[in-house]
Amino acid sequence: MPRENRKRGKKHKKPKEEESFGQQAHQEQQYFEPEQPVENGEPSWIRPAPRDQDDFNPEAPFGYVDQDVKAYFRTVDVQIRDWQENAVDDGNEDNDPNEEKRLFFVAALNEMREKEKQLATDPDCSVILERMAHSMDDFVRRVFVDSLAGSFEILAKHRFASHVVQTLFVIARETIARETRGFFPKMEGQEDSGELRTLTQLTLDICEELLPNLSSLVLDPFASHVLRALFLLLSPNTAAEEDNILRSKKSSAWKAKQGSMKSLFADNKGKQKEDTRRSVPAEFTNMSRRFIQELRTNLSGNEVRAMAASKVASPTLKVLLGVEAELGLSDEPESLLDHVTMGVISHTHSGSTTLPEASDFVGTLLRDPASSHLLEAIVSRCPESSFGTLWQLYFKGTLARLAAHPVANFVVAKAIERASVEQLQDIASELEGTWNKNIRTSRTGVLRAFIERSAVLNAMEKETKQAVQSAFGVESADANLIHCILTVLTLEDYKAYKAEATSKPKAQRDGNQRHRRGNQQDSDPLAFKTQGSILLQALLKLPEPQINFVLEALQQVPVEDKIKICHDPSASRVYDAFLENANIPSKAKRQWIMELIGHYHELVDDRIGSRVADRCWAFCDTYLKEKIARSLFKYESQLAGSFYGKFFVRNLNLHLLQRRPEEWRNMQSQKKIQAEQAQARNQRSSKPAPAAVNGTPGAESDATAPAKPAKRKRAKADNEIEELFDATLGRKIKKAALGDGIGATSENKETPKPEKAKKKDKSSGEDPSLAAVFGAIKAAPKHDDSNPKKKKKKRT
């Protein structure tokens, strides 16, 4: 299918041939039907011009894009994607690498002028506008949003333009955050064009435009996700999982096929996790309050509950409940939360001691695949007093059935995350005989939430251990417990599958082992599963008295199985949690690392295993590091040829350990101290420094990102020999070196030259460590070239 005919979104079913043929015949019959004579005194051959019954075209409400313009923007899209995917640094510092991109982008913006609405509603160009929006600076974003002003209701309901508006709301957060701090771009030569509103004011005007028809927009299949992005813009602290809220799985999969959506001018390499808590203007909080009050006024309780049951409106209502809780309006009668929970908030404020009657509507939400996400937000956001009522009405007494339900078990797990000690006791008593059934159906969420909540409250030590042993059918803390948890199998099933795998021919077992990491993981019942890894990581978060049975089981695992666990992408995270948890005694960690000595050459010869080995190396002290390094002497050449092991061996610096062990120990001790200091600096929270705003595209894209440590070249002081030279002779940088020429010149000027008369006295105050280094240099052979140059024979 040609690209211009492709459309994004849900496809409509084609009408049957008979119906289309009948409609076509009917239209032809209407077209050739003789017209009635006009009774206006004019001749019969004078006919009035045909009038269009409906001039508004919902597919192109602002007109179609010219084919030449569309072809031009296809070229723009191809060029932008090529620059993003094949970024090449020419290495010329004299030329601006973004100059060509900037000129190209400005030309595309000029071509887009006065065609913004047509391009936004076009099936092909809407995606191109989304890609270009990420590269716009603050000023261009304001101009682009201002060009769409007055038509946002139509655009929000449009199949393609709604995605453009949603993208604008997402990228507007950075600009609004800068405007809140008082940073505005310079507008040169724009005095005659009138006053351009700030993006903050434009957002408020958009809200005023959408506010009268809010009730209908929430139920619109295209405008609902636009409202979600708008609510998250007005109240950014509402939800952390913004991507899951804004897009469905189908939309996210389609978006991933469109390539990278990032700024063309910003370097996002090494970008840290974005801070979700931003400062917003006070007007945004008031506007959020107006949205909540508008829905409360115009919607009845039945209409709110209809939204909760709708696949389109339920995700938007989930965001609205988060905004309502953020504003502190949830704990009020007739609130949105009160309507969805069938008056639980009103009953709490009435002061009645008797429980209200349980509602079948809430019970339906528990088991509905779409609405259960809304109920998860309710049990997480509702006030503490209302949560107790919800627990008594809908969870207590029915936990065994809900935990086994394929949908309701997720809501139960979310409710357990805020349960009290008394409620945990109810869970342990009700699910005492059903843990094993949940494991057989691979539903581990309730057990994981129970373990994590027990760790937070530091309670239910005996019940937690009994729940784990009952779930997997393991009586003692041995290696089978770890294998059963990682494979999410009961002990009976694990032994049966293991016996079946042992009876197979060796060639077939080797084939299954090779494919274990691929898509055939589900076909192998003994493969490690992500659910089991997460469950075991939750067990490792328990306090020390409760975690002892897990540590005993980990110690019983054979070394060969430990290597397999370290080589698995999901199961290896267990040992990451094991080394990072401060509640686990250091003695247990050292014992686990010592057991791997003699097998590190197998561990590091793998993509995942080398990462685990780096974790172990970072935890070890100098004594353990030396034992690990000496165990790899005979495997040095083997690991040097390994694709993954060579990096680990290079970090060990085995040559220095063989020649000068004491110097190697000092170097490792110093690296350990530097790593601890760097970790302490990273843990200190620092406020992000505001970046200067200029008029270049993409200059402000990372201004609101959290403060990151400046990327520095690896300091030469890491090498002890360089340190000794710097401490004794001072740092001397040649003019041809790749350093700061100004700094090098100043240092050379400040460093006094030693006098020749004091040359003899210098040896008396010489650093002994430096003398040892000079002695080693003198003792080294002068001709140590591996490939000495051959002398040319003279012609005779």
Swiss-Prot record:
This is Nucleolar protein 9. It comes from Coprinopsis cinerea (strain Okayama-7 / 130 / ATCC MYA-4618 / FGSC 9003). It is found in: Nucleus, Nucleolus. RNA-binding nucleolar protein required for pre-rRNA processing. Involved in production of 18S rRNA and assembly of small ribosomal subunit. Belongs to the NOP9 family. One of its GO terms (biological process) is endonucleolytic cleavage in ITS1 to separate SSU-rRNA from 5.8S rRNA and LSU-rRNA from tricistronic rRNA transcript (SSU-rRNA, 5.8S rRNA, LSU-rRNA). Pfam families: PUF_NOP9. The keyword Membrane does not apply. InterPro entries: ARM-like, ARM-type_fold, NOP9, Pumilio_RNA-bd_rpt. Its main location: nucleus. Keywords: Nucleus, Repeat, Ribosome biogenesis, rRNA processing. Residues 1-61, 501-526, 665-719, 737-796 are annotated as: Disordered. The gene is NOP9. Residues 21-30, 666-686 have a biased composition (Polar residues). GO terms for cellular component: 90S preribosome; nucleolus; preribosome, small subunit precursor. Residues 1-14 have a biased composition (Basic residues).
